[in-house]
Amino acid sequence: MSKQTRPHRNFYGRLKGKSLKAAQKRYLDEDLAALSPGAVGWEENPDRRPLDLPGLFEGKPVWLEIGFGGGEHLVHQAAQNPDIGIIGAEPYINGVAMLLGKIRRAGVENLAVHAGDARDLMDVLPAASIDRAFLLYPDPWPKARHHRRRFVTAEHLDPLARALKPGSVFRVATDIEDYVRQTLQEVPKHGFKWLANAPQDWRRPWPDWISTRYEQKALREGRTPHYLTFVRE
């Protein structure tokens, strides 16, 4: 494969917040490199060679969480599903550091972590290689002029659809009603079908759900979580 031209990608949002604790810096120094899913960045993989997911996870089915926040859900799923390999993508380094601490405490070994833009990761995921994907409480970008920054746009949904296997599940959780509107409007345009027949299908959490700190904040502030399930057609 010849070297590809790197696309221009705007990145919006924070990469780093308040100062990291000494332990968090140590986790990043000692653990992050070993949890890499492989060559994702353009500098190390300009040809955009696909990742070797069977080699990474010993042939296990692979799940993907896009924007894992503090990592509660990611570690929970890894602990509950040891026969699944899970990749988490998160550009916010404070969230990555929080996740690494949780991984140490939980002792899970079926995780890989991309500390960067999910678009770069999706570039190098093999076609039809992912069995399940999660988008949980993504940045809502509430201003109308910023809605194009949301994940549920063609720029993100097309590469996600390419990476997901037919019949695989895509879960979206959000407490923002307009994000629900845009999700239901845009996701079905890109090869997905919404699995809902009645209101309880999106009001009720999934059976294996763990409530995250983002969800708890939404509940305290009086917002209603929505749990949307799609299948890749």
Swiss-Prot record:
GO terms for cellular component: tRNA methyltransferase complex. GO terms for molecular function: tRNA (guanine(46)-N7)-methyltransferase activity. It is an enzyme of class 2 (transferase). S-adenosyl-L-methionine binds at residues 65, 90, 117, 139. Pfam families: Methyltransf_4. Pathway: tRNA modification; N(7)-methylguanine-tRNA biosynthesis. Its EC number is 2.1.1.33. The active site is at 139. Keywords: Methyltransferase, S-adenosyl-L-methionine, Transferase, tRNA processing. Substrate binds at residues 143, 175, 212-215. It catalyses: guanosine(46) in tRNA + S-adenosyl-L-methionine = N(7)-methylguanosine(46) in tRNA + S-adenosyl-L-homocysteine. InterPro entries: SAM-dependent_MTases_sf, tRNA_(Gua-N-7)_MeTrfase_Trmb, tRNA_methyltr_TrmB_bact. Catalyzes the formation of N(7)-methylguanine at position 46 (m7G46) in tRNA. PANTHER family: 3-DEOXY-D-MANNO-OCTULOSONIC-ACID TRANSFERASE/TRNA GUANINE-N 7 - -METHYLTRANSFERASE (PTHR23417), PENTACOTRIPEPTIDE-REPEAT REGION OF PRORP DOMAIN-CONTAINING PROTEIN (PTHR23417:SF14). Belongs to the class I-like SAM-binding methyltransferase superfamily. TrmB family. This is tRNA (guanine-N(7)-)-methyltransferase. It comes from Roseobacter denitrificans (strain ATCC 33942 / OCh 114) (Erythrobacter sp. (strain OCh 114)). The lineage of its organism: Bacteria, Pseudomonadati, Pseudomonadota, Alphaproteobacteria, Rhodobacterales. The gene is trmB.
